[in-house]
Design a protein with these regions (language model features):
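Active-site and adjacent substrate-binding regions of carbohydrate-active enzymes
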Residues: 1-543
Length: 543
């Protein structure tokens, strides 16, 4: 029987260099990360997703890779990596890593060989044109920062394609040699103990755009089947988590019959979730949940609030996007790429823990696998003085002491500045203070994670949206193996109540609530405080 561990997983995303510095050089490392696994264990994490940790010039937070088979020396050694994997395993945590193979760094030896010699075997590993292509600005990913998707290389005397920054030349994934190398990279890290990959930029990875070939690509998604087949052969329980900002209509091509991507991030639902939060009504999120297709096979959606990138609102209408900007980032400096916000969750709510807790409870109640960005569990803010998406990647705030407990290095040697001023500074927001106090934000989130882990109905089961006649409430019913959990969330800033008109419910047992007196009134009415939430198990303990 397949090990579908991801169905009830709690995924925690870590940028290693910003998490914990063990050797005092100012950059987080694998030894430091291993030393802080107890924090993740207290939170209830079962899977750690690592942002790129490979050798890199680090012009794009490590997503510009110069060696796929190594560790950035500032982060440690392969030995440190394996020790971290074992330490995580001892705590029941799996590890998945970023697979960034749409492009390389322009400093990668493959690209250096390709540009130096038109007869190099690596020349066709990239996408070249002798003449300047038409529409070199068509399809820019980073408006306002990126100037084109083709650049001229003087050494090669040719144009190369880069869907992202010009220092990230695209690999030619129609080349069988490139595809074989991708499988080799996967096999290497699987052998070192990882449990799968978060696959970066999947729509661009499989897109044959710009490639000149006599054999047109009939189905670009077939590449995903190749990757899945290799993964299943090497490590059957490993997963593929796709970063794919796609419509629901496109989703079946990514899941297929369970033989492509294991999970896909629900970007559509994420944007509708924030539109709901901005408007104070559950209606947009309710509509997206109703429209979201059920993955075939054993596929799963991955759900999230924030991540290491901008909050991408590009799929909303201009009016809807402006509503989100007005609610969560009215200053133009908070906005980015004409489509998103470069803010962390806590600062978007101005530190309002009532609304933050409701948002986290909502995340964990959504059908799918929840993904948490490091630091959000303690309510960290962002540093808007940093460029672009770097604003949300500041070092983890561990304590109120020097450098927030992140590093003993001098302040000017830190990989990124710590937030040391204002209400979100490490003097006020840190893990040490919160873990010591049972009524802290961290413990509230840990309690929610515990409720989610004890509710496989949410991860495994089918979900039904219950109509209680109020657009400001989202009430979900999740069923699995004869058990049922009902979750309710109030998007309004005023108290709400509702009745469950269901003859199959004989008893409701509160699992989680923001109310100190419990959500169930004497007449069976369920009451929610402003921005309140509750989780209820139907008919007693889970059987």
């Amino acid at each position: 029987m397949a090990n579908l561990w991801y169905k009830n997983a709690i995924v925690y995303c870590v940028d290693v260099k910003s998490f914990m510095d063990a050797n005092g050089d100012g950059t987080g490392d694998f030894v430091g990360l291993a030393d802080r696994l107890d924090h993740l264990e207290r939170l209830g994490v079962t899977c750690i997703w690592l942002n790129p940790f490979y050798p890199s010039p680090r012009r794009d937070n490590g997503y510009d890779i110069s060696d796929y088979y190594g560790i950035d020396p500032a982060l440690g050694t392969l030995g440190d990596f394996v020790e971290f994997i074992e330490a995580a395993k001892d705590r029941g945590m799996r590890v998945i890593v970023d697979l960034v193979v749409n492009h390389t760094s322009d400093e990668h030896p493959w690209f250096q060989a390709a540009r130096a010699d038109p007869n190099s075997p690596y020349r066709d590993w990239y996408v070249w044109r002798d003449e300047k292509p038409d529409n070199i600005t068509d399809g820019i990913v980073f408006p306002g920062v990126q100037k084109a998707i083709w650049s001229y290389d003087r050494t090669a005397k040719a144009w190369y394609m880069h869907r992202f920054y010009k220092f990230q030349p695209d690999l030619n994934t129609t080349n069988p040699a490139v595809r074989q190398e991708i499988l080799k990279i996967m096999g290497f890290w699987l052998a070192l103990g990882v449990s799968g990959f978060r696959v970066d930029a999947v729509p661009f990875l499989i897109e044959p755009r710009g490639v000149l070939t006599d054999k047109p690509v009939v189905d670009p998604h077939a590449m995903l089947t190749e990757i899945h087949d290799f993964l299943s052969w090497r490590k059957a329980e490993a997963i593929l988590l796709a970063e794919a900002n796609i419509s629901y209509e496109e989703a079946p091509d990514y899941f297929a019959a369970g033989d492509r991507m294991t999970m896909v991030f629900d970007f559509v639902g994420n944007q509708q979730l924030f539109l709901s939060l901005a408007r104070g009504t559950a209606a947009p999120l309710r509509r997206s949940l109703a429209a979201r297709p059920e993955p075939q096979g054993m596929g799963q959606w991955a759900v999230f609030l924030r991540n290491h990138d901008e909050l991408n609102l590009g799929n909303l209408t201009e009016q809807e996007r402006e509503q989100c900007f007005s609610a969560f980032g009215p200053d133009p400096n908070m906005q980015i790429y004409d489509r998103g916000l470069r803010r962390r969750l806590a600062s978007m709510f101005n530190g309002d823990q009532t609304r933050l807790k409701m948002a986290f409870s909502l995340l964990l109640a959504l059908p799918g696998t929840p993904v948490i960005w490091y630091g959000d569990e303690i309510g960290m803010g962002e540093d808007l003085a940093l460029p672009e998406r770097e604003a949300v990647r500041t070092p983890m705030q561990w304590s109120p002491r020097h450098n927030g407990g992140f590093s003993d290095a001098p302040k000017d040697r830190l990989v990124r500045p710590l937030i040391d001023r204002g209400k979100f500074s490490y003097h006020h927001v840190n893990a040490a203070m919160q873990t010591q106090h049972r009524n802290s934000f961290f413990h509230a989130i840990a309690d929610m994670v515990s409720a989610r882990r004890s509710s496989p109905e949410v991860g495994w089961g089918g979900v039904e949206i219950i109509d209680v006649g109020d657009d400001e409430l989202l009430v979900l019913s999740s069923r699995w193996r004869g058990n049922r959990v009902i979750t309710a969330h109030n998007f309004a800033g005023e108290p709400k109540s509702f009745h469950l008109a269901d003859e199959g419910i004989e008893e409701l047992m509160p699992m989680l609530t923001d109310s100190p007196t419990g959500p169930i009134e004497g007449d069976g009415e369920i009451a929610l405080s402003p921005y309140g939430y509750c989780w209820l198990r139907c008919n007693g303990e889970r059987r």
